[in-house]
Structures are given as C-alpha cells and as structure tokens.
C-alpha cells in the first residue's frame, strides 16, 4: 500500500492532497486535490481502472486516504515519507 517516490510509474497519476499553497511552493507533479474533496467525490477525480499515487507532507494522511480509497475499489498507493522526505534528498 506504500511506495517510494522512485517507484512511481506514471507521474501524471500523482494526487497531492496538501493545501494549494503547499503544492505551489513545492510539488512533484500530478494534481492537487484536497483530501476532503478526494474522499467526498472519488468518482469525480479517479478511475477504478487506473493506479494513483497519493502524497502528503509526511505520508500519514496519504496512507489513511489510500486505505479508504482502496476499500472503495480504487487502486492507490501512499508515497512513503511524503514531500518532507523528498525535500531532505
């Protein structure tokens, strides 16, 4: 359920659930969709035939979000360590 940033196959399928301000300051590509919007309307943002990579600051919010989305039938992975770990590189 977790994946390293280097293992992401399609950066177009990255979903960054941080605030738009955080996303604009530093991002790894993909789309910025707040966690609440993503969980309220996953069918609007996601296709059950695709794989998505959920990222947040530390990896904890993305992991909980990923668990919920996977339970709903979506194929999602949480980016381990989040943006904070990536900034340390």
Question: What does each model-identified segment do?
Answer:
Residues 42-87:
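Catalytic cysteine-centered active loop of the rhodanese-like fold, especially the PTP/DSP P-loop
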Residues 21-23, 39, 60-62:
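Glycine-rich nucleotide phosphate-binding loop and flanking beta-alpha elements
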Residues 12, 30-33, 52, 76-77:
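Hydrophobic anchor at the start of a short beta-strand
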Residues 17-19, 35, 81:
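Active-site loop/turn elements of alpha/beta-hydrolase fold enzymes
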Residues 25, 40, 88:
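Phosphate-coordinating loops and pocket residues in cytosolic domains that bind phosphorylated ligands
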Residues 1-30:
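Flexible, polar/low-complexity N-terminal or interdomain linker segments that lie immediately upstream
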Residues 33-41:
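Glycine-rich, highly charged phosphate/nucleotide-binding loops
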Residues 1-3, 16, 38, 46, ...:
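Residue-level detector of functional hotspots within protein domains
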